[in-house]
A protein has these predicted regions:
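Short alpha-helical transmembrane segments in multi-pass integral membrane proteins
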Residues: 1-15, 69-136, 169, 180-237, ...
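Transmembrane helical elements of multi-pass membrane transporters/channels
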Residues: 10-29, 132, 165-166, 195-199, ...
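Residue-level hotspots within the lipid-embedded alpha helices of multi-pass solute transporters
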Residues: 19-23, 56, 96, 100, ...
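Small-residue hotspots at the loop-to-helix junctions and early N-terminal turns
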Residues: 38-49, 126, 130, 189, ...
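Small-residue-rich hydrophobic transmembrane alpha-helices
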Residues: 41-101, 140-159, 265-331, 363-387
Length: 443
Protein backbone atom coordinates (compact mmCIF):
# COMPACT_ATOMS: atom_id res chain seq x y z
CA UNK A 1 0.00 0.00 0.00
CA UNK A 2 1.39 3.40 -0.98
CA UNK A 3 -0.34 5.27 1.87
CA UNK A 4 -1.03 4.03 5.38
CA UNK A 5 -3.84 5.45 7.49
CA UNK A 6 -1.19 7.48 9.31
CA UNK A 7 0.13 8.85 6.00
CA UNK A 8 -3.36 9.95 4.99
CA UNK A 9 -3.98 11.66 8.32
CA UNK A 10 -0.61 13.46 8.12
CA UNK A 11 -1.64 14.79 4.71
CA UNK A 12 -5.30 15.59 5.42
CA UNK A 13 -5.22 17.17 8.90
CA UNK A 14 -2.83 20.02 7.97
CA UNK A 15 -4.87 20.57 4.79
CA UNK A 16 -8.04 20.93 6.87
CA UNK A 17 -6.33 23.40 9.15
CA UNK A 18 -4.97 25.29 6.14
CA UNK A 19 -8.44 25.48 4.58
CA UNK A 20 -9.87 26.68 7.88
CA UNK A 21 -7.31 29.46 8.02
CA UNK A 22 -7.97 30.43 4.40
CA UNK A 23 -11.69 30.71 5.12
CA UNK A 24 -10.95 32.72 8.27
CA UNK A 25 -9.23 35.37 6.13
CA UNK A 26 -12.49 35.93 4.25
CA UNK A 27 -14.57 35.82 7.42
CA UNK A 28 -12.36 38.33 9.23
CA UNK A 29 -12.45 40.67 6.24
CA UNK A 30 -16.24 40.48 6.06
CA UNK A 31 -16.66 40.99 9.80
CA UNK A 32 -14.25 43.92 9.83
CA UNK A 33 -15.75 45.68 6.83
CA UNK A 34 -19.29 45.11 8.14
CA UNK A 35 -18.54 47.86 10.65
CA UNK A 36 -18.75 50.29 7.71
CA UNK A 37 -22.22 49.24 6.57
CA UNK A 38 -23.91 47.06 3.96
CA UNK A 39 -22.51 49.04 1.01
CA UNK A 40 -18.97 48.17 2.10
CA UNK A 41 -19.91 44.51 2.65
CA UNK A 42 -21.56 44.35 -0.78
CA UNK A 43 -18.63 46.09 -2.51
CA UNK A 44 -16.06 43.73 -1.02
CA UNK A 45 -18.32 40.76 -1.83
CA UNK A 46 -18.58 41.70 -5.49
CA UNK A 47 -14.81 41.97 -5.88
CA UNK A 48 -14.27 38.72 -3.99
CA UNK A 49 -16.17 36.97 -6.76
CA UNK A 50 -13.67 38.29 -9.32
CA UNK A 51 -10.78 37.44 -7.00
CA UNK A 52 -12.16 33.92 -6.70
CA UNK A 53 -12.13 33.64 -10.49
CA UNK A 54 -8.43 34.57 -10.62
CA UNK A 55 -7.61 32.34 -7.65
CA UNK A 56 -9.51 29.39 -9.13
CA UNK A 57 -7.57 29.62 -12.39
CA UNK A 58 -4.33 29.75 -10.37
CA UNK A 59 -5.52 26.73 -8.39
CA UNK A 60 -6.24 24.88 -11.63
CA UNK A 61 -2.73 25.54 -12.94
CA UNK A 62 -1.34 24.51 -9.55
CA UNK A 63 -3.39 21.31 -9.76
CA UNK A 64 -1.76 20.57 -13.11
CA UNK A 65 1.65 20.99 -11.54
CA UNK A 66 0.71 18.91 -8.50
CA UNK A 67 -0.58 16.04 -10.65
CA UNK A 68 2.56 15.97 -12.80
CA UNK A 69 4.87 16.23 -9.76
CA UNK A 70 2.93 13.50 -7.92
CA UNK A 71 3.08 11.14 -10.89
CA UNK A 72 6.85 11.65 -11.27
CA UNK A 73 7.28 10.98 -7.54
CA UNK A 74 5.15 7.84 -7.87
CA UNK A 75 7.60 6.68 -10.56
CA UNK A 76 10.59 7.58 -8.36
CA UNK A 77 11.84 10.28 -10.77
CA UNK A 78 12.54 13.10 -8.32
CA UNK A 79 14.69 15.21 -10.65
CA UNK A 80 11.88 15.45 -13.18
CA UNK A 81 9.47 16.25 -10.38
CA UNK A 82 11.82 19.10 -9.41
CA UNK A 83 11.88 20.42 -12.97
CA UNK A 84 8.10 20.28 -13.31
CA UNK A 85 7.73 22.17 -10.01
CA UNK A 86 10.00 24.95 -11.26
CA UNK A 87 8.03 25.19 -14.49
CA UNK A 88 4.83 25.48 -12.46
CA UNK A 89 6.36 28.46 -10.62
CA UNK A 90 7.21 30.07 -13.97
CA UNK A 91 3.75 29.51 -15.46
CA UNK A 92 1.93 30.88 -12.41
CA UNK A 93 4.17 33.93 -12.12
CA UNK A 94 3.61 34.88 -15.76
CA UNK A 95 -0.15 34.38 -15.48
CA UNK A 96 -0.49 36.34 -12.22
CA UNK A 97 1.56 39.30 -13.47
CA UNK A 98 -0.65 39.54 -16.56
CA UNK A 99 -3.78 39.42 -14.39
CA UNK A 100 -2.46 42.17 -12.11
CA UNK A 101 -1.64 44.45 -15.03
CA UNK A 102 -5.06 43.93 -16.60
CA UNK A 103 -7.02 44.32 -13.35
CA UNK A 104 -5.23 47.49 -12.25
CA UNK A 105 -5.49 49.05 -15.72
CA UNK A 106 -9.21 48.40 -16.15
CA UNK A 107 -10.55 48.34 -12.59
CA UNK A 108 -13.67 50.50 -12.90
CA UNK A 109 -14.60 49.56 -16.51
CA UNK A 110 -14.36 45.87 -15.62
CA UNK A 111 -16.51 46.25 -12.52
CA UNK A 112 -19.08 48.33 -14.40
CA UNK A 113 -19.21 45.74 -17.17
CA UNK A 114 -19.96 42.95 -14.70
CA UNK A 115 -21.92 44.78 -11.98
CA UNK A 116 -23.21 47.86 -13.79
CA UNK A 117 -26.53 48.04 -11.95
CA UNK A 118 -25.17 48.32 -8.40
CA UNK A 119 -25.50 51.44 -6.27
CA UNK A 120 -22.71 54.02 -6.63
CA UNK A 121 -21.63 53.67 -2.99
CA UNK A 122 -21.17 49.93 -3.51
CA UNK A 123 -19.22 50.53 -6.75
CA UNK A 124 -16.83 52.98 -5.05
CA UNK A 125 -16.02 50.43 -2.35
CA UNK A 126 -15.56 47.70 -4.95
CA UNK A 127 -13.13 49.77 -7.07
CA UNK A 128 -10.92 50.56 -4.09
CA UNK A 129 -10.86 46.98 -2.81
CA UNK A 130 -10.21 45.50 -6.26
CA UNK A 131 -7.29 47.78 -7.13
CA UNK A 132 -5.42 47.07 -3.90
CA UNK A 133 -5.96 43.30 -3.77
CA UNK A 134 -5.08 42.86 -7.46
CA UNK A 135 -1.53 44.03 -6.73
CA UNK A 136 -0.98 40.88 -4.65
CA UNK A 137 -1.80 38.35 -7.42
CA UNK A 138 1.86 37.54 -8.30
CA UNK A 139 2.64 36.69 -4.68
CA UNK A 140 -0.52 34.60 -4.44
CA UNK A 141 0.65 32.76 -7.55
CA UNK A 142 4.02 32.06 -5.92
CA UNK A 143 2.25 30.73 -2.83
CA UNK A 144 -0.08 28.45 -4.82
CA UNK A 145 2.79 26.99 -6.84
CA UNK A 146 4.83 26.28 -3.73
CA UNK A 147 1.88 24.78 -1.86
CA UNK A 148 1.20 22.44 -4.81
CA UNK A 149 4.84 21.33 -4.88
CA UNK A 150 4.91 20.51 -1.17
CA UNK A 151 1.53 18.74 -1.31
CA UNK A 152 2.77 16.58 -4.18
CA UNK A 153 5.42 15.09 -1.87
CA UNK A 154 2.84 14.59 0.88
CA UNK A 155 3.93 17.57 2.98
CA UNK A 156 0.93 19.78 3.72
CA UNK A 157 2.35 21.24 6.93
CA UNK A 158 4.31 23.90 5.05
CA UNK A 159 1.25 25.51 3.49
CA UNK A 160 -0.57 25.17 6.81
CA UNK A 161 2.17 27.05 8.67
CA UNK A 162 2.25 29.78 6.05
CA UNK A 163 -1.54 30.06 6.32
CA UNK A 164 -1.08 30.72 10.02
CA UNK A 165 1.35 33.51 9.14
CA UNK A 166 -1.14 34.94 6.63
CA UNK A 167 -3.91 35.00 9.21
CA UNK A 168 -1.77 36.64 11.87
CA UNK A 169 -0.74 39.38 9.44
CA UNK A 170 -4.30 39.80 8.17
CA UNK A 171 -5.86 40.07 11.63
CA UNK A 172 -3.13 42.39 12.92
CA UNK A 173 -3.40 44.53 9.80
CA UNK A 174 -7.17 44.75 10.08
CA UNK A 175 -6.91 45.76 13.71
CA UNK A 176 -4.43 48.51 12.82
CA UNK A 177 -5.84 49.79 9.53
CA UNK A 178 -9.56 49.46 10.27
CA UNK A 179 -9.87 50.18 13.97
CA UNK A 180 -6.89 52.48 14.56
CA UNK A 181 -6.47 54.30 11.23
CA UNK A 182 -10.19 53.99 10.26
CA UNK A 183 -9.35 53.09 6.66
CA UNK A 184 -12.43 50.83 6.28
CA UNK A 185 -12.42 49.04 2.90
CA UNK A 186 -8.90 50.22 2.05
CA UNK A 187 -7.64 48.88 5.38
CA UNK A 188 -9.17 45.45 4.81
CA UNK A 189 -7.76 45.31 1.28
CA UNK A 190 -4.28 46.36 2.40
CA UNK A 191 -4.24 43.72 5.15
CA UNK A 192 -5.21 41.02 2.66
CA UNK A 193 -2.57 42.16 0.17
CA UNK A 194 0.21 42.28 2.77
CA UNK A 195 -0.64 38.79 4.02
CA UNK A 196 -0.42 37.43 0.45
CA UNK A 197 2.89 39.18 -0.22
CA UNK A 198 4.38 37.68 2.94
CA UNK A 199 3.08 34.20 2.09
CA UNK A 200 4.47 34.33 -1.44
CA UNK A 201 7.94 35.38 -0.32
CA UNK A 202 8.19 32.80 2.48
CA UNK A 203 6.89 29.98 0.26
CA UNK A 204 9.40 30.81 -2.48
CA UNK A 205 12.27 30.65 0.00
CA UNK A 206 11.10 27.25 1.30
CA UNK A 207 10.63 25.79 -2.19
CA UNK A 208 14.31 26.47 -2.85
CA UNK A 209 15.39 25.33 0.62
CA UNK A 210 16.89 22.07 1.84
CA UNK A 211 13.68 21.05 3.66
CA UNK A 212 12.02 20.43 0.28
CA UNK A 213 12.74 16.85 -0.95
CA UNK A 214 12.41 18.07 -4.55
CA UNK A 215 13.93 21.48 -3.90
CA UNK A 216 14.51 23.83 -6.80
CA UNK A 217 18.15 24.70 -6.16
CA UNK A 218 19.24 26.23 -9.47
CA UNK A 219 17.92 29.09 -11.56
CA UNK A 220 18.19 26.95 -14.71
CA UNK A 221 15.09 25.03 -13.63
CA UNK A 222 12.98 28.17 -14.05
CA UNK A 223 13.90 28.66 -17.72
CA UNK A 224 10.71 27.83 -19.65
CA UNK A 225 10.77 24.22 -20.90
CA UNK A 226 7.84 23.43 -23.18
CA UNK A 227 8.09 19.68 -22.51
CA UNK A 228 7.17 20.17 -18.85
CA UNK A 229 4.87 23.14 -19.40
CA UNK A 230 2.84 21.09 -21.88
CA UNK A 231 2.30 18.34 -19.30
CA UNK A 232 1.25 20.88 -16.67
CA UNK A 233 -1.10 22.61 -19.09
CA UNK A 234 -2.58 19.27 -20.19
CA UNK A 235 -4.18 19.21 -16.74
CA UNK A 236 -4.08 22.93 -15.99
CA UNK A 237 -5.83 24.28 -19.10
CA UNK A 238 -8.94 22.05 -18.93
CA UNK A 239 -9.09 22.57 -15.16
CA UNK A 240 -8.53 26.30 -15.65
CA UNK A 241 -11.29 26.50 -18.26
CA UNK A 242 -13.53 24.50 -15.93
CA UNK A 243 -12.80 26.68 -12.91
CA UNK A 244 -12.85 29.86 -14.97
CA UNK A 245 -16.19 29.13 -16.60
CA UNK A 246 -17.52 28.02 -13.22
CA UNK A 247 -16.56 31.34 -11.66
CA UNK A 248 -17.82 33.33 -14.66
CA UNK A 249 -21.13 31.57 -14.25
CA UNK A 250 -21.09 32.48 -10.57
CA UNK A 251 -20.33 36.09 -11.49
CA UNK A 252 -23.40 36.12 -13.72
CA UNK A 253 -25.45 34.75 -10.85
CA UNK A 254 -24.01 37.36 -8.47
CA UNK A 255 -24.88 40.05 -11.02
CA UNK A 256 -28.41 38.66 -10.95
CA UNK A 257 -28.41 38.85 -7.16
CA UNK A 258 -27.20 42.47 -7.32
CA UNK A 259 -30.45 43.39 -9.09
CA UNK A 260 -32.37 42.19 -6.02
CA UNK A 261 -30.89 45.02 -3.90
CA UNK A 262 -28.14 45.67 -1.36
CA UNK A 263 -29.74 43.51 1.36
CA UNK A 264 -29.81 40.50 -0.96
CA UNK A 265 -26.23 41.11 -2.12
CA UNK A 266 -24.98 41.38 1.46
CA UNK A 267 -26.91 38.26 2.53
CA UNK A 268 -25.54 36.32 -0.42
CA UNK A 269 -22.00 37.39 0.50
CA UNK A 270 -22.37 36.40 4.14
CA UNK A 271 -23.94 33.11 3.09
CA UNK A 272 -20.98 32.20 0.90
CA UNK A 273 -18.56 33.21 3.65
CA UNK A 274 -20.24 30.97 6.22
CA UNK A 275 -20.75 27.91 4.02
CA UNK A 276 -17.04 27.83 3.29
CA UNK A 277 -16.63 26.54 6.85
CA UNK A 278 -19.01 23.65 6.25
CA UNK A 279 -17.05 22.67 3.14
CA UNK A 280 -13.64 22.54 4.83
CA UNK A 281 -13.43 18.76 5.53
CA UNK A 282 -14.64 17.63 2.10
CA UNK A 283 -12.61 20.30 0.27
CA UNK A 284 -9.44 19.33 2.17
CA UNK A 285 -9.91 15.67 1.36
CA UNK A 286 -10.40 16.56 -2.28
CA UNK A 287 -7.00 18.29 -2.26
CA UNK A 288 -5.43 15.27 -0.55
CA UNK A 289 -6.82 12.96 -3.23
CA UNK A 290 -4.87 14.85 -5.91
CA UNK A 291 -1.63 13.80 -4.22
CA UNK A 292 -2.78 10.28 -3.32
CA UNK A 293 -4.36 9.35 -6.65
CA UNK A 294 -1.59 11.11 -8.60
CA UNK A 295 1.09 9.01 -6.92
CA UNK A 296 -0.98 5.84 -7.36
CA UNK A 297 -1.38 6.50 -11.09
CA UNK A 298 2.33 7.28 -11.44
CA UNK A 299 3.17 3.97 -9.73
CA UNK A 300 0.69 2.08 -11.94
CA UNK A 301 -1.52 1.18 -8.95
CA UNK A 302 -5.00 1.83 -10.37
CA UNK A 303 -6.75 -0.45 -7.87
CA UNK A 304 -5.23 1.51 -5.00
CA UNK A 305 -6.33 4.78 -6.61
CA UNK A 306 -9.93 3.57 -6.60
CA UNK A 307 -9.69 2.17 -3.08
CA UNK A 308 -8.24 5.37 -1.59
CA UNK A 309 -10.88 7.46 -3.36
CA UNK A 310 -13.70 5.46 -1.75
CA UNK A 311 -12.04 5.65 1.65
CA UNK A 312 -11.38 9.38 1.61
CA UNK A 313 -14.82 10.13 0.12
CA UNK A 314 -16.39 8.32 3.06
CA UNK A 315 -14.31 10.44 5.44
CA UNK A 316 -15.44 13.58 3.62
CA UNK A 317 -19.07 12.68 4.27
CA UNK A 318 -18.37 12.23 7.97
CA UNK A 319 -16.76 15.68 8.06
CA UNK A 320 -19.59 17.20 6.02
CA UNK A 321 -22.25 15.98 8.44
CA UNK A 322 -20.17 17.01 11.47
CA UNK A 323 -20.04 20.60 10.17
CA UNK A 324 -23.46 21.10 8.60
CA UNK A 325 -25.69 19.80 11.36
CA UNK A 326 -24.39 22.27 14.01
CA UNK A 327 -24.41 25.12 11.46
CA UNK A 328 -28.08 24.47 10.70
CA UNK A 329 -29.04 25.16 14.31
CA UNK A 330 -26.58 28.05 14.72
CA UNK A 331 -27.55 29.89 11.52
CA UNK A 332 -29.43 32.69 13.29
CA UNK A 333 -26.68 33.24 15.83
CA UNK A 334 -23.96 33.32 13.17
CA UNK A 335 -25.92 35.72 10.94
CA UNK A 336 -26.14 38.16 13.86
CA UNK A 337 -22.34 38.62 13.80
CA UNK A 338 -22.41 40.59 10.55
CA UNK A 339 -24.41 43.69 11.54
CA UNK A 340 -26.92 43.20 8.71
CA UNK A 341 -30.38 44.71 8.43
CA UNK A 342 -33.34 42.61 9.59
CA UNK A 343 -34.20 41.78 5.97
CA UNK A 344 -30.66 40.70 5.09
CA UNK A 345 -30.38 38.66 8.29
CA UNK A 346 -33.57 36.73 7.52
CA UNK A 347 -32.42 36.00 3.97
CA UNK A 348 -29.05 34.81 5.29
CA UNK A 349 -30.61 32.39 7.79
CA UNK A 350 -32.92 30.92 5.14
CA UNK A 351 -30.23 30.26 2.54
CA UNK A 352 -27.79 28.88 5.13
CA UNK A 353 -30.26 26.30 6.42
CA UNK A 354 -31.19 25.22 2.90
CA UNK A 355 -27.52 24.78 2.12
CA UNK A 356 -26.88 22.74 5.26
CA UNK A 357 -29.60 20.22 4.40
CA UNK A 358 -28.65 19.76 0.74
CA UNK A 359 -24.90 19.64 1.41
CA UNK A 360 -25.31 16.63 3.68
CA UNK A 361 -26.08 14.44 0.70
CA UNK A 362 -24.41 15.74 -2.47
CA UNK A 363 -21.58 18.25 -1.83
CA UNK A 364 -18.77 15.63 -1.54
CA UNK A 365 -20.00 13.83 -4.67
CA UNK A 366 -20.14 17.10 -6.58
CA UNK A 367 -16.72 18.45 -5.58
CA UNK A 368 -14.52 15.96 -3.68
CA UNK A 369 -15.09 13.14 -6.19
CA UNK A 370 -13.99 15.25 -9.15
CA UNK A 371 -10.40 15.56 -7.90
CA UNK A 372 -9.44 11.86 -8.27
CA UNK A 373 -10.68 12.06 -11.84
CA UNK A 374 -8.44 15.09 -12.46
CA UNK A 375 -5.46 13.43 -10.77
CA UNK A 376 -5.79 10.47 -13.14
CA UNK A 377 -5.73 12.83 -16.14
CA UNK A 378 -9.47 12.63 -16.88
CA UNK A 379 -9.72 16.42 -16.96
CA UNK A 380 -11.65 16.80 -20.19
CA UNK A 381 -14.57 14.89 -18.71
CA UNK A 382 -14.68 16.94 -15.51
CA UNK A 383 -14.35 20.13 -17.55
CA UNK A 384 -17.21 19.21 -19.89
CA UNK A 385 -19.53 18.18 -17.07
CA UNK A 386 -18.78 21.24 -14.95
CA UNK A 387 -19.23 23.75 -17.78
CA UNK A 388 -22.47 22.24 -19.09
CA UNK A 389 -23.90 21.87 -15.60
CA UNK A 390 -22.93 25.42 -14.63
CA UNK A 391 -24.57 27.11 -17.61
CA UNK A 392 -27.52 24.79 -18.08
CA UNK A 393 -28.45 24.15 -14.47
CA UNK A 394 -26.92 26.81 -12.19
CA UNK A 395 -27.32 29.88 -14.38
CA UNK A 396 -30.49 28.66 -16.08
CA UNK A 397 -32.17 27.42 -12.91
CA UNK A 398 -31.12 30.52 -10.98
CA UNK A 399 -32.85 32.70 -13.54
CA UNK A 400 -35.99 30.56 -13.51
CA UNK A 401 -36.28 30.25 -9.73
CA UNK A 402 -34.83 33.64 -8.79
CA UNK A 403 -36.26 35.95 -11.45
CA UNK A 404 -39.12 34.22 -13.27
CA UNK A 405 -40.65 32.63 -10.17
CA UNK A 406 -39.69 35.60 -7.99
CA UNK A 407 -37.87 33.68 -5.26
CA UNK A 408 -34.94 36.13 -5.25
CA UNK A 409 -31.73 34.98 -3.59
CA UNK A 410 -33.32 31.73 -2.40
CA UNK A 411 -34.12 30.89 -6.02
CA UNK A 412 -30.49 31.48 -6.97
CA UNK A 413 -29.35 29.06 -4.27
CA UNK A 414 -31.90 26.47 -5.43
CA UNK A 415 -30.31 26.77 -8.87
CA UNK A 416 -26.94 26.05 -7.25
CA UNK A 417 -28.34 22.90 -5.63
CA UNK A 418 -29.68 21.69 -8.99
CA UNK A 419 -26.17 22.17 -10.43
CA UNK A 420 -24.65 20.09 -7.63
CA UNK A 421 -27.11 17.25 -8.23
CA UNK A 422 -26.28 17.12 -11.94
CA UNK A 423 -22.52 17.16 -11.31
CA UNK A 424 -22.82 14.45 -8.65
CA UNK A 425 -24.72 12.11 -10.97
CA UNK A 426 -22.15 12.52 -13.77
CA UNK A 427 -19.10 12.04 -11.54
CA UNK A 428 -20.55 8.97 -9.78
CA UNK A 429 -21.35 7.33 -13.14
CA UNK A 430 -17.82 8.06 -14.40
CA UNK A 431 -16.20 6.73 -11.23
CA UNK A 432 -18.20 3.49 -11.21
CA UNK A 433 -17.51 2.88 -14.91
CA UNK A 434 -13.74 2.95 -14.34
CA UNK A 435 -13.17 4.96 -17.52
CA UNK A 436 -11.39 7.66 -15.50
CA UNK A 437 -8.53 5.19 -14.95
CA UNK A 438 -7.92 4.64 -18.66
CA UNK A 439 -6.12 7.96 -19.26
CA UNK A 440 -2.77 6.74 -17.94
CA UNK A 441 0.19 8.61 -16.44
CA UNK A 442 1.50 11.88 -17.87
CA UNK A 443 4.91 11.34 -16.28
Amino acid sequence: MLFSGKDLRKLIIPLMFEQLLAVLVGLVDTLMVSQSGEAAVAGVALVDNINRLIIQVMAALATGGAVVCSQYIGKGRDDESRKSGAQLETVLLIFSVIMTAFSVSFTRPLLKLIFGTVEESVMDCAVLYFMITALSYPFLGMYNAGAAIFRSVGNSKVSMNISILMNVINVAGNALFVFVFKWSVAGVALSTALSRVSAGIVMSVLVCGKTNPVRIDHVKYFVPDWNYIKKILTIGIPSGIENGMFQIGKLMVVSMVATFGTASTAANSVGYTVIDFANIPAASMGLALITVVGQCIGAGEKAQAKMYTKKVLWWSYIGDWACNIPLFFMAGFIASWFHLSAEATQITVTILRCFNVVSLFIWPLSFTLSNPLRASGDVKYTMTVSIISMWLFRVGSSYIFGVVLGLGVLGVWIGMFVDWAARSACFVIRFISGKWLERGSLA
